Amino acid sequence: DSSWKRIIYLICTIQVGGGITIIGVISFIPLFLAELGLHDQGQAAMWAGIVSGVTPLMVALSAPYWSRKANQWGPRKVMMLILFILMITVGACAFTQTPMQLLILRTLQGVVGGYVPIGLAIIVLITPENKVPWAMGLYQASMVMGLVFGPLMGGLVADLLGYRAPFFVFSALTGICMLGIYFLMPNLQFKHKVDESVSEISLIKYFLSIPRVRLLVGMLFLCNFGITGIGPILPLYIK
């Protein structure tokens, strides 16, 4: 039975689309901020860093909450809800008139962006034990593809159609991902129920109390910092 493979391919495709949506603005966000009234390059660089970084930050903070909801409601329903709200907030960015409005919407995108651990949990749930390394590798590759193709896609669309057009494109892409979940993903239920009396903060504290987990988190932070740190200011430097 290869039905589990179809679900994995779907989850990985959703991950690519979601990654493109969240990270794709990096290639043009400083220039868009100038269109919103920030003509000083120093201010534009600062706001670009804040606007670009707040979304991944909120994704990291909100992921435990959405993972818990996936245990309660089922991963299919939660992922559809996340993608629907993400579609609305990304599309709304095209109508922003001030940097603060853009920052608020980017923050909301991060709050509802915690679909990565849900996808990972689905893969672990449905994949045969001897195929888990392959499935995990494919999922990690899809995350990298989103990081690679997002800025490229955002920059190309912004160059051709203006700085507001990519938000419409990313919103439509998120909508397609949501429809893919609706039509192609079966209803699944995680086998292990989470103790509702345990808060997300206590769970985070527990995992961070493990030395190897702290080391892994630190290494991942430094790697991602090195890869994406220059992204918000690179368009200004090239300009």
Which sequence ranges carry the predicted segments?
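Juxtamembrane intracellular "pre-TM" segments in multi-pass secondary transporters
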Residues: 1-4, 187-217
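Extracytoplasmic gate region of multi-pass secondary transporters
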Residues: 26-27, 214-239
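Short amphipathic helix-loop junctions that connect adjacent transmembrane helices
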Residues: 28-45, 233-239
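Conserved MFS/SLC helix-loop-helix module at the cytosolic interface between two early adjacent transmembrane helices
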Residues: 61-93
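Paired small-residue
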Residues: 89, 100-108
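Cytoplasmic helix-loop-helix junction between adjacent transmembrane helices
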Residues: 105-143
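Central cavity-lining transmembrane alpha-helices of secondary-active solute carriers
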Residues: 50-66
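Helix-loop-helix hairpin linking two adjacent transmembrane segments in secondary transporters
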Residues: 139-182
